[in-house]
């Protein structure tokens, strides 16, 4: 499904990623572990197309995508990415965070409503649908971000530190949802 080989990235004379290799099959949950500053986020950003590697390759479904921009990896390659930084549209409601992305993807109005309701239910945020995203707790915000990442129905999702700043109970709940996505 996803093969990353020999990724290298330097900023000036500082090499932040040095020959990273990994392979992920459909249904697998794989983590990148290491101390702060080890290059995990840079590796994610190179893998999803936000940052161009100095060397190395990214294959998605057997296709070379190293030179593809992020949007193309998402649309044609089925890759979703959730950054560690907050990515909600703060002034939009929870439901409009989902509906807006679906509209950009060209999904029809009736299907947008159906999928929005489905995602709100799946992530336990239906009661928050009219709330502004800026008013959400850390766990609620993260649920919304993951739901929004799933709007495009990606084949693979890269989650960069998905549990930062979230309480243990919410972490368990989100982990359960993620495990349920493996089907």
Predicted regions and their residues:
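Catalytic Walker B motif of ABC-type/P-loop ATPase nucleotide-binding domains
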Residues: 157-160
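Conserved ABC ATPase signature
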Residues: 132-136, 140
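The feature captures the beta-strand-to-loop junction immediately N-terminal to the Walker
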Residues: 33-35
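Helix-to-loop junction immediately C-terminal to a conserved catalytic motif
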Residues: 48
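ABC ATPase NBD coupling module
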Residues: 64-80, 85, 109-113
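Conserved ABC ATPase "signature" region
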Residues: 99, 110-128, 175-179
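Conserved catalytic motifs of ABC-family nucleotide-binding domains
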Residues: 153
């Amino acid at each position: 499904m996803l093969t990353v080989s020999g990724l290298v990235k330097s900023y000036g004379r500082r090499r932040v990623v040095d020959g990273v290799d990994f392979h992920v099959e459909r249904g697998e949950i794989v983590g990148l572990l290491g101390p702060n500053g080890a290059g995990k986020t840079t590796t994610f950003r190179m893998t999803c197309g936000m940052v161009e590697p100095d060397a190395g390759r990214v294959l998605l479904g057997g296709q070379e995508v190293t030179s593809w921009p992020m949007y193309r990896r998402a649309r044609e390659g089925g890759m979703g990415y959730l950054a560690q930084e907050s990515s909600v549209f703060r002034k939009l409601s929870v439901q409009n965070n989902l509906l807006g992305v679906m509209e950009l993807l060209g999904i029809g109005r009736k299907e947008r409503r159906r999928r929005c309701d489905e995602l709100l239910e799946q992530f336990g945020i239906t009661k928050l649908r009219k709330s502004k995203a800026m008013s959400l707790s850390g766990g609620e915000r993260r649920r919304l971000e993951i739901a929004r990442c799933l709007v495009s129905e990606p084949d693979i999702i890269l989650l960069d530190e998905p549990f930062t700043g979230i309480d243990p109970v919410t972490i368990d709940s989100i982990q359960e949802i993620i495990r349920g996505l493996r089907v």
